[in-house]
Design a protein with these regions (language model features):
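C-terminal helical subdomain
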Residues: 119, 181-184, 201-229, 233, ...
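Active-site helix of classical SDR
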Residues: 122, 158, 166
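Alpha-helical segment proximal to the catalytic Tyr-Lys
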Residues: 127, 170-175, 231
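Short C-terminal tail/terminal secondary-structure segment
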Residues: 93-96, 147, 223, 234-251
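Substrate-binding pocket helix/loop in short-chain dehydrogenase/reductase
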Residues: 97-99, 106-108, 137, 192, ...
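Residue(s) in the substrate-gating loop at a strand-loop-helix junction
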Residues: 142
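Conserved glycine-rich cofactor-binding loop
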Residues: 16-18
C-alpha cells in the first residue's frame, strides 16, 4: 500500500517492540517519517525492516544517557530535517515488591530512565526544532501513575512524576508545542507480561471491555495526540485502560 507523505517527522523512544513499536507503526501508516530509539541494535534493525527502511531510521542507545539524547535528535534532524513530534516511551520496571523493601538505587534507576530521560529528550527536541517551529510531545505514563498499584510502586511513582512533567512542559512550551500524556493500563507486551502471564483470561475479566490492551491501542491514541484533531488539547493525560477504572465506582 502506498502511503502519502505527511511531511511530518516523529522521534519515538523505546520503539523496537511493544508500545513504542505500535506507536511508530501508527505514525508511519499515516505518512510520517519516524526515528526510533532503543538499546538493542538487532531488535531495532528488525523493527526498521518491518516498518519500512524508506521511512524509518534506528538510533541505538540508552535512554538515560544524555549524549544519546542529544545524538538521537541530531541524527533525526540530519536524516529528515525536522522533528515535529516526540514520543517519550522508553522506560524500565525492573522490580516488583513492596515499597518498604525497595532498593533505593533501583528506585533511582527507574526514575532516571522513566522521567529524567523524557525531560532530556524534550529539552533536545525543543532546542533543535520545536521552539521555533512548533509540534507536539506525548509522554507514555501509566494508570499506575494515576492511582496506586500493588507491587509496582517504584514504577508508579515515576509515572506520576511523568504526568506532572507533562503538565509542567505543557505550561512552559505553550503556545508553540502541545504536551500530553497517555496512561495505559495493562498492555500485552514483553515489558508487562509479568502482570498477566499464565492468567490472561482472569486478568482480562476485570476489564469492562473484556480484554487487555494491545500496542495498537496506544498507537492510535498517540496518533490522535500528534494530529490536528487535538490542536486544542495540552497538559492532559489520556487514560487508555479498557474501562478498568470504572470498577472503582462499582459496589
Amino acid at each position: 500500500m502506498t502511503v502519502q507523505d505527511s511531511g511530518k517527522v516523529a522521534l519515538v523512544t523505546g520503539a523496537s517492540r511493544g508500545i513504542g513499536y505500535g506507536i511508530a507503526e501508527a505514525l508511519v501508516a499515516r505518512g510520517d517519517r519516524v526515528a526510533i530509539t532503543g538499546r538493542g541494535e538487532d531488535a531495532l534493525k528488525e523493527a526498521v525492516e518491518r516498518l519500512g527502511a524508506d521511512r524509518v531510521i534506528a538510533i541505538p542507545g540508552k535512554a538515560h544517557d544524555e549524549a544519546h539524547q542529544a545524538a538521537a535528535v541530531e541524527r533525526a534532524m540530519e536524516a529528515f530535517g525536522r522533528v515535529d513530534y516526540l514520543v517519550n516511551n522508553a522506560g524500565t520496571n525492573p522490580v516488583f515488591g513492596p515499597m518498604a523493601e525497595l532498593d533505593l538505587n533501583v528506585a533511582r534507576k527507574v526514575y532516571e530512565t522513566n522521567v529524567i530521560s523524557a525531560l532530556g529528550f524534550a529539552q533536545q527536541t525543543w532546542k533543535a526544532w520545536q521552539k521555533e517551529n512548533g509540534g507536539a510531545i506525548v509522554n507514555i505514563a501509566s494508570v499506575a501513575g494515576v492511582a496506586p498499584s500493588p507491587f509496582i510502586g517504584a514504577y508508579g511513582m515515576s509515572k506520576a512524576a511523568m504526568i506532572n512533567l507533562t503538565a509542567q512542559l505543557a505550561h512552559e512550551f505553550a503556545p508553540v508545542v502541545r504536551v500530553n500524556a497517555i496512561a495505559p493500563a495493562v498492555v500485552k507486551t514483553k515489558f508487562a507480561e509479568a502482570l498477566y502471564e499464565g492468567r490472561e483470561a482472569e486478568a482480562a475479566a476485570a476489564y469492562p471491555l473484556g480484554r487487555l490492551g494491545v500496542p495498537e491501542d496506544i498507537g492510535g491514541a498517540a496518533a490522535f495526540l500528534t494530529s490536528a484533531q487535538s490542536d486544542w488539547i495540552t497538559g492532559q493525560t489520556l487514560v487508555v485502560d479498557g474501562g478498568i477504572f470504572l470498577n472503582a465506582g462499582v459496589g
